[in-house]
């Protein structure tokens, strides 16, 4: 499905739901035909001239945003400078996923693959994992990119991942916030390179833009109450943080914290969601250890100072 936002800016929605392994893409149908993210699937991309796409901007390196790159053989591909390694260094790519800590956090070796829980559709060309991509350049915070006559400003918005970017169309006041996505489950910060504090700061950065239209990677287009939606979204993580800190009034183990109702399991208690929930709890704890507000007692035991 294509949603025309005006001024040659269009949202490409996947044929199915815009959830893993899919994401929304933004298509700029101007002199330089440009795509933001490449995870909408081949069926969705059948509606645009794939051979004419000249530029692809990637919000970050996660699989559901990159698996469709091969549909666009003539495109110059750009990523944020902070995450370019994910397309070039296999070892660093896998470290950011954090699965090397699986046995430590889960108590048993990791045996299951994500694709065993979510079989990939036919229009997803590749499987999750490292794939070397020849980048045609990188962008940094506040870089201005011209897609023909359309101005796009790259916004470094870390937290979901260290190199996560949003993209702002200042002349149209349209914001693409990527995986800061207004999910009813709140932000996701379960990667090795995720950061709870950065999520809060990045959402504030987006609010300060005062956009009139908000596009996200996995939801619909929002035209109203955008500041309210962003604040409610990040408040889910803030409320979770307050629950964790209240529970640390005495020494607690990570498993004890994870046993509390912290609102992680909107997609079910799969092994992957349990693992990611523990990583996110650790992101809260790391944030407060750095602030001197939590003490690490060793063996994944923590207490509030």
Predicted features and spans:
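Conserved beta-strand hairpin/beta-sheet module of binuclear metal-dependent hydrolase folds
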Residues: 1-49, 165-180
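Short Pro/Gly-enriched beta-strand edge/turn motifs at strand-loop
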Residues: 5-13, 122-128, 148-150
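Divalent metal-coordination and catalytic microenvironments
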Residues: 8, 28, 37, 60, ...
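Active-site HxH/HxHxD metal-binding segment of metal-dependent hydrolases
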Residues: 21, 42-145
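Alpha-helix C-terminal capping segments
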Residues: 27-29, 36, 43-52, 67-74, ...
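Residue-level marker for buried hydrophobic side chains located in beta-strands
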Residues: 34-36, 57, 77, 174-176, ...
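Metallo-beta-lactamase
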Residues: 40, 127-128, 151-241
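C-terminal regulatory/interaction regions
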Residues: 243-305
């Amino acid at each position: 499905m294509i949603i025309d936002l005006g001024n040659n800016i269009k949202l490409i929605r996947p044929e199915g739901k815009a959830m893993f392994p899919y994401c929304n893409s933004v298509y700029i149908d101007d002199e330089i035909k440009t795509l933001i993210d490449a995870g909408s699937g081949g069926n969705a991309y059948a509606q645009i001239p794939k051979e004419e796409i000249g530029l692809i901007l990637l919000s970050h390196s996660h699989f559901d945003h990159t698996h469709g790159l091969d549909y666009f053989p003539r495109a110059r591909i750009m990523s944020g400078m902070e995450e370019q390694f994910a397309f070039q260094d296999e070892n660093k790519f896998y470290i950011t996923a954090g699965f090397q800590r699986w046995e430590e956090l889960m108590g048993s070796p990791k045996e299951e693959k994500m694709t065993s829980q979510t079989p990939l559709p036919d229009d997803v060309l590749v499987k999750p994992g490292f794939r070397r991509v020849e980048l045609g350049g990188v962008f940094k915070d506040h870089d201005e990119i011209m897609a023909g006559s359309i101005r796009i400003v790259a916004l470094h918005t870390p937290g979901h991942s260290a190199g996560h970017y949003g993209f702002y169309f200042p002349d149209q006041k349209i914001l693409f916030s990527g995986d800061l996505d207004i999910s009813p489950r709140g932000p996701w910060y379960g990667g090795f390179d995720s950061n709870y504090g950065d999520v809060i700061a990045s959402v504030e950065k987006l609010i300060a833009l005062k956009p009139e239209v908000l596009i996200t990677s996995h939801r619909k287009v929002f035209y109203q109450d955008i500041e309210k939606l962003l604040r409610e979204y990040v408040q889910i993580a803030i409320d979770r943080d307050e629950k964790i800190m209240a529970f640390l009034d005495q020494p607690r183990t990570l498993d004890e914290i994870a046993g509390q109702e912290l609102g992680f399991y909107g997609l079910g208690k799969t092994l992957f969601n349990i693992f990611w929930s523990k990583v996110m709890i650790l992101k809260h704890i790391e944030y407060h250890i750095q602030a001197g507000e939590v003490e690490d007692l060793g063996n994944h035991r923590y207490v509030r100072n």
